[in-house]
Amino acid sequence: MATSERFLPWSRATVFKHSPALARLLEHSFQPGSPETALNCPTLTATHAALLECAPCKICQLVYSLASDPACEVAFFEDYACLCFYALYAPLCWTSTFMAAADFLELVSRYFPGAVGEGGLYGPEGIMAVDLQLHFLIKRCFRPVAASELLDVCNLHFLKSEFLKGALTGSVSNLFCFKSIWGSMHAPAVKQQAGGGGCGCCGLSSSLSAAAPADKRRAGGGGGAAETRRPEFAEAVSRAFPQGGGRAQTGVKPELLSVFLDVWGESDLLSEANREMAAAAPARAAGALGRFEFTYPETADRCQGPCMLSQALQLKKSNRTASICVLCECIAGHAEGAEALRLLKRDILTFVENNVKIPDRISFIVRQRDSLVYVRDPLLRGVIRGCSEQEIHKHLFCDPLCALNSASACPDILFGEPGEEELRILKSSLAIGNHLAENIFLDCEVLHTLVIIFKSIQLCKVGKTTFLEIIKELNHQLKNHNLQTLHTFHTATIYC
């Protein structure tokens, strides 16, 4: 039975309310500590099984069974749709998966407490991190799809699953030929773009902003030096989440970045400076928001941390960068994160007129005592300054996933505090399928698929021809969507 308290995703209070269950999910999100235990590791077995394209989606199965209950309240549909809406505007990163886990557990325990069971909702015998990722962030099962487009979408999802399996196991099948499969796909968006045309799916009228021109929406993704005003939401959304100046009007939710630091403090992910900041968390939390307590399992690979909640499924490091981007976590975990990084990128580009290398520009700016003065929260400022020059370079100028996250995420939605009436109207609209078909800032299933494939081939072995074909196609798509990054071959060879 529902409580009188309203459901609002991305809330810090939800994390602490369900901390024991989330700790269980984290415990089963580690790589095994030794090769001898890998074959019988329940986490790896369950994750690999979920990535099979013939495997059912555990979230879809559970939601369908709950929704089929005659006693199911209308409010459940509204709140579930609200969570899906937040996931649509969240970056693809560790924090987003973690928050989806917290919010989904809150929904199930609120409306169907008997469905949780004594063993909990999360674990090898139930729902795993990969199930949450696939449903809410990678395949987005909640999105409306026309019958004529379903097979095309399934083909793209197959490619995502195949390369994610490669990231998990370390290699993609020798029988797999990307060029042959990609070239034979009959998806209209693939064929149109392969022929030199624009992005068909991003040119469609959005359910959120039917009047927004395609070129304006693509420019809203940014990535270049020039700033373009983002498209506007439909009325029901804009009333709940006024963009820009609306933050002061509606308020802002507490940050989640400190929870990320709490969980990752013992791993090898954080830089020395950020590790010290994580170690100082108890002093900060004494009179503030509280600390998320979590103990790493003894038999797990503690160096990699709970990496299975990340799309990378492992923690790999190269040239002072990692397969899990701390700056993407800043976007998902702090209301100021996206704007702070946008302003930092502007400062880097305009720092000097000479042909100074970007990593040098970054180091000069970060060294200045008054750098990032526009960031009000010292925690966020400290985390950004604690990142290496290479991490900042990778996030702002190189990595296609970071560029995609920066273009499509919406802090106004994730961290806004909508009024009661505005939220009620929005949820009613979401429950009948409105506003879930497309992210109005940047939404292309072809590009999304290629980015996931690219991040996977950074972590697993593929043939030389396959590698180069993926690089070529991804560069073409990034250019089509006005996402200006360094050539992805450059990124793939030096960074994670």
From Swiss-Prot:
Binding site for Zn(2+) 3: C201, C202, C444, H481
Annotated Zn(2+) 2 binding sites: C325, C328, H395, C402
Main location: host cell
Protein's cellular compartments: Host cytoplasm; Host nucleus
Region span, Zinc finger 1: 57-141
Entry's transmembrane regions: none
Disulphides: none
Alphabetical UniProt keywords: Host cytoplasm, Host nucleus, Metal-binding, Zinc, Zinc-finger
Residue span of region Zinc finger 2: 325-402
Region feature Zinc finger 3, mapped onto this chain: 201-481
Domain of life where this protein originates: Viruses
Leader sequence segment: none
Keyword Zinc-finger among UniProt keywords: yes
GO cellular component: host cell cytoplasm; host cell nucleus; viral envelope
Sites where the protein binds Zn(2+) 1: C57, C60, H135, C141
Residue ranges that the Swiss-Prot or TrEMBL entry lists as coiled coil: none
Function: Plays a role in efficient localization of neo-synthesized capsids to nuclear replication compartments, thereby controlling cleavage and packaging of virus genomic DNA.
Similarity field: Belongs to the herpesviridae UL32 protein family.
Protein name per its UniProtKB record: Packaging protein UL32 homolog
Gene (UniProt): 68
